[in-house]
Amino acid sequence: MGQTVTTPLSLTLDHWKDVERTAHNQSVEIRKRRWVTLCSAEWPTFNVGWPRDGTFNPDIITQVKIKVFSSGPHGHPDQVPYIVTWEALAADPPPWVKPFVHPKPPPLLLPPSAPSLPPEPPFPTPPQSSLYPALTSPLNTKPRPQVLPDSGGPLIDLLTEDPPPYRDPGPSSSDGNGGSGEVAPTEGAPDSSPMVSRLRGRREPPVADSTTSQAFPLRQGGNGQFQYWPFSSSDLYNWKNNNPSFSEDPAKLTALIESVLLTHQPTWDDCQQLLGTLLTGEEKQRVLLEARKAVRGEDGRPTQLPNDINDAFPLERPDWDYNTQRGRNHLVHYRQLLLAGLQNAGRSPTNLAKVKGITQGPNESPSAFLERLKEAYRRYTPYDPEDPGQETNVAMSFIWQSAPDIGRKLERLEDLKSKTLGDLVREAEKIFNKRETPEEREERIRRETEEKEERRRAEDEQREKERDRRRHREMSKLLATVISGQRQDRQGGERRRPQLDHDQCAYCKEKGHWARDCPKKPRGPRGPRPQASLLTLDDQGGQGQEPPPEPRITLKVGGQPVTFLVDTGAQHSVLTQNPGPLSDKSAWVQGATGGKRYRWTTDRRVHLATGKVTHSFLHVPDCPYPLLGRHLLTKLKAQIHFEGSGAQVVGPMGQPLQVLTLNIEDEYRLHETSKGPDVPLGSTWLSDFPQAWAETGGMGLAFRQAPLIISLKATSTPVSIKQYPMSQEARLGIKPHIQRLLDQGILVPCQSPWNTPLLPVKKPGTNDYRPVQDLREVNKRVEDIHPTVPNPYNLLSGLPPSHQWYTVLDLKDAFFCLRLHPTSQSLFAFEWKDPEMGISGQLTWTRLPQGFKNSPTLFDEALHRDLADFRIQHPDLILLQYVDDLLLAATSELDCQQGTRALLQTLGDLGYRASAKKAQICQKQVKYLGYLLKEGQRWLTEARKETVMGQPTPKTPRQLREFLGTAGLCRLWIPGFAEMAAPLYPLTKTGTLFKWGPDQQKAYQEIKQALLTAPALGLPDLTKPFELFVDEKQGYAKGVLTQKLGPWRRPVAYLSKKLDPVAAGWPPCLRMVAAIAVLTKDVGKLTMGQPLVILAPHAVEALVKQPPDRWLSNARMTHYQALLLDTDRVQFGPIVALNPATLLPLPEEGLQHDCLDILAEAHGTRPDLTDQPLPDADHTWYTDGSSFLQEGQRRAGAAVTTETEVIWAKALPAGTSAQRAELIALTQALKMAAGKKLNVYTDSRYAFATAHIHGEIYRRRGLLTSEGKEIKNKDEILALLKALFLPKRLSIIHCPGHQKGNHAEARGNRMADQAAREVATRETPETSTLLIENSAPYTREHFHYTVTDIKDLTKLGATYDDAKKCWVYQGKPVMPDQFTFELLDFLHQLTHLSFSKTKALLERSYSPSYMLNRDRTLKDITETCKACAQVNASKSAVKQGTRVRGHRPGTHWEIDFTEVKPGLYGYKYLLVFVDTFSGWVEAFPTKKETAKVVTKKLLEEIFPRFGMPQVLGTDNGPAFVSKVSQTVADLLGVDWKLHCAYRPQSSGQVERMNRTIKETLTKLTLATGSRDWVLLLPLALYRARNTPGPHGLTPYEILYGAPPPLVNFPDPDMAKVTHNPSLQAHLQALYLVQHEVWRPLAAAYQEQLDRPVVPHPFRVGDTVWVRRHQTKNLEPRWKGPYTVLLTTPTALKVDGIAAWIHAAHVKAADTRIEPPAESTWRVQRSQNPLKIRLTRGTS
């Protein structure tokens, strides 16, 4: 009890040295990690019974060995060493294995005797319990002697025995009574445990007629006393390993423990051992806590008394004697409480999603599925599935979660509500048993396929016959045309034969005989007439000849395929169809029939075989065929060959031209020249290494790599995205790939909650498709791992220049070499249907899929691990790996060939496959990662250059980003790339206006030109030091990294980068320090920490060692010193002068300068500015600024004083900071001392530093912070810097603030501080910010009165004041009309208040001037404000109109859809028909809101009952405006009227009926308690049809001429009144009554129509605003203005909006508002000669 369990796997790991010795004896090698993986993960999946902990059973080992040694693709040759070693350990076991080897039957042994306890007098049997059986009375038999096994060995076979609990062996029987003598073996078998009995049954011959008994830890012995038999270790081991954990399946483990408690009667210690073995520590504590909660007190309720709880369920070992009645009672009670604790602790939190996730399996019976469903209810919900109240929920779950075919049929059962759960199970069983077998399904699919093929074959034959018949008919017509043409040529025209004389022969043209007597005419039978040749060149110009085959080619222009005729005689290419917008350029085209002017198209993007280009075509509609001219043929690099089969147009390399589309970053591959390898792979390399090539070795499998387990994020849930629609061409294109992957086992069928769509991608240049899975949603839910894929930027740094023989290998289908663990395969499922293969469901990958975000990293790491031994074994070779691209470099050709052979052998042995087509073996020049490697240097390939050069001028930010991204890949070859591209980068920012100007075009051309002249760069040699030449210009760092090659310096990389805003504002010497630091950090990626010598035209080392603290912050200073003063890695060379073009040193020396001196001179703004007092100063002033809080408001003031008096003081606006006030005071002092010598004292460090140091720094960096934002107090700083130059001589001195001395400095500072506080407290601060350089405000001298102003003033009675030089009215100067307009317009722009509110504000406020024409000007401003017109609401002045109604029932209907929630049985909508004459309503519940539903109900419900309607009125819903509905209406002659959009009053009758029906349904559901609104709909319709209308009549009375049947229902016995005269009279009077009702109603409706309606005031040509019905955040309420084109009394149509607009949704626009831009109309021709195209443009 409590001992550690030993398994075969752990046993082998503990004796691993012996295992390796056994493997060595078998001549194999094994690895410990691989040993564990195969035993615990791989071999259990063979389904031969191999346990995860291993076994030494020879039968199971043999089964696994058969699987491993299986021939073909299903074998596992890599696992042979391991299974052979397992077999050797089992066949010849070492001493530590022997106890675990499957035993042979031992000789007969007597069973051991059980220890007995001292006898006690018999005791009464405890009362029987429903949980535990009664103990049987002891048998009076003598126990047989028992031979105990060796204590050193295991008691039982831990691996071959079945786990308890055991089946009850049944009641024991005995033929004789016990005695004191020796008892025969057949009568006195002792009590033993079931395990011992089972072992004895296996290892001993069975004992005949032996007495059987129950073996428990507590059992009653032969002497009446209880004996204790502890649990065996094998019981506990088997219970734990053959049952799920408590957290996984608490019900199953609880049932196991319940059976153990029931049958074994364990003691308190046994219970603790059982719980400790089967439960975790946390689970055990939870069970014990729940059990203690279940302890009940004397009242039968759970108690909280600790004494009672500890007595009933102690946590420490109690003193319970199981040989006493009391002790056994305690144990029984303890077990009951323990079982209750297990049940309560096993209850999971309520999780209905878990219940919903239980679905029926493909081959699972309905009854088994129902049991699983009920178990889920018990486990994850607090409901009991057996409770009758929960039967409905369980039944619904059973229906919805059954198999799709069973669920659909169960949903269609009649009277589904009355079905019980048992009825549903029986129906499901019937459906399940009637399913077709797999053989029947295959037979059905085969039969359907054959029928489909037969129909297709018949259709093809019919089409072929029709095509032949049509071809023969056309050929006959053609022959007739040819022959008739030839006859006409012979009979007339210039070719008519001369007229014969009367005696002239028509055959030989001689006279004297006729043709029938001509001796020269051949005699004999007439031969067959030769067929007319239509395609010969010697046909003498006969009519009707078919032209020779014309070379054609299909290109994609503007995204559409266009078939061109190749015409080398055409200079330009021609389009005949309408190409869209045309440019303003035109050209004169000279053709065979004359000349004509045609226009050019705008630039179109054309997909060529050489890439995407933009091209402008001539639009010639008269041309019979689109022409491919010489200009585009030149871009295409086309070649035309004339052969016997006709003309062929091919590309530059002889390949057929096709439509091509690809990513822009891969475009360089289009220009690559496909050169075959120098070494013939087919002869030697392919045959020597067949397993290393994909062409000969098949699909690879990295068998050394364990299956990959993909980890999900903690909050991830399965995502299911349906498959996108796929064309037939694409489906047929990817079908062979799917079939191939299925045959190879890479794809397998599955059922998964995950699903992502499959995308067919067409391969460039071919018609082949390849399947690509969209795994973006899966990638979002998978855990991110750190990417370890090498950086291509510095990957080649590990390739020394001495290795100049290269081999490049590209692994094919690399990701498919790694296996996926079965638990992770379901993540990558997708849909696939193929009736021919019998597949209709999901497929998933068993290998690592492409498109998965972690695939490159996982494969790169796996390949690195597998190739680690190769790198160790070949230290002289350089092997670089970038995912699946390998580069092997050697110093000689022989080493390269030997290394390549070893690498191919290694790859083949490891299970990887290389592509022979892409292999470059043992060459001195190879292409790797888009670069050309040759002689220790790397070049830009011509393909990459042509890619950049072939890109058109960018027109959008996206195109510019594409260009910069493509060119940026080549920036190492372009000196100063960052400086060249500087004008381009601002245009790529979001929200920036894309304006391509001369600067951008110049930068664009410079980058292309630099790319054409790109030099070769040497590969970094890590054995040599590096030299970095750095220069800086206008905030851009430029440098070149070089290495010595003999006497020369060979460039390794060109570097350039833009400095940050702070560094860009420094003096030149400090900018050089920043440039060196930036480039040194970038260079570290290439130098790999090797020594670096920095050469620059500045003494940088001295600046770094003693940096000026005025310019650099401490953090930046520390960073620069740590980076540049690392003497072990970075050294500074002598100062050199650099060539601006090459960045290399010039032969002559540059100008010498001292950087420290220059910095000292450049730190200030004014050179003579000092901080020491001037002895001859004209003034000595003190400045101060004060900012403080007073009564919750921040007050501020500034002052300039002497020691005794205030020179200047002013209050500043509220909220002004103290720093700003100090700047203002200092600036004011400098301005007042213009042209004088000044000493000025300030106690502000901020103002003092700004004037002396920081102001100049801010100015140099553009007044920006380190984050690129604008600094605070920008205007005040600029004003201060400008004012520094006003005094003749200046000294700004800092003095401590708040001094208490009596010297002049302290007195002046106190005076300035006091003056600033007093002025801030005394004066009211201004409402606007003080501007240093503010223009003077308007005064009366600026008033200029116009002639109109003077006339208005004269009428007003104003007088002119000569003294004030202005007009005066009511004692106030009069403001001119123009000034009034400017002031009021500015005020309105700030507030956008209405006329009345603005006027009220002006009247309440005091104004020192009188505003001339204030009210008129203000009204004009408010009425013409465009923003107010677009936003302000407007009251509708349109009066309500009158609806048109029918003249009799059934002629005029209004229709509408309304949504009813919640939906029931799939019904979500209600289709409502209302007869406008009578108000009669018909309503139908529908599942969809479609035109098909409308027409179906109209034809099947309305037409048969009410006749064909004449008018239908609806809104503009999709179901009513669709072509289906309108076509049906046209065919039936129905006038379908569409009402105004967003105007429900137009359909007011049906809209009101919708509301009535919904309100009635709501009341009915509340009254009845039912949610079935479909069932309650007839009652709602009954109410609507019997509700009196406006004229006091109900729709029922109007329609049927009788009162509504509300109370007097007819007698059920209708036979009595069938022939009643009163009934007949009533029926006869019905016709008359209806007419008496209908005529007055029709007259009343007509009277409403005849009543005059006041129309809206809008007329054709007016300008109106249109209401925006769906506004977004901060979007104006009105749009426009628009021009009115058509009007009706209630609606109007405007220019630019297709639908009619109700007059209530528009408002007049003021004509003075800026009108919309004038439109110009352009007429264009179309393909149809009877149509023209009108295009409107803005002039």
From Swiss-Prot:
Residues anchoring lipid (N-myristoyl glycine): G2
All residue ranges annotated as the Reverse transcriptase domain in the record: 742-933
Chain ranges of the Peptidase A2 domain: 562-632
Cofactor(s) this protein requires: Mg(2+)
Coiled coil: 439-479
Comp. bias (Basic and acidic residues): 435-467, 487-500
SMART domains: ZnF_C2HC
Pfam family, one: RVP
PTM sites of type Phosphoserine: S193
Record carries keyword Metal-binding: yes
Cellular component GO terms, alphabetical: host cell late endosome membrane; host cell plasma membrane; host multivesicular body; membrane; viral nucleocapsid
Residues binding Mg(2+) 3, per UniProt: D1456, D1515
Motif segment (PPXY motif): 163-166
Protein name: Gag-Pol polyprotein
The organism's taxonomic lineage, starting at the top: Viruses, Riboviria, Pararnavirae, Artverviricota, Revtraviricetes
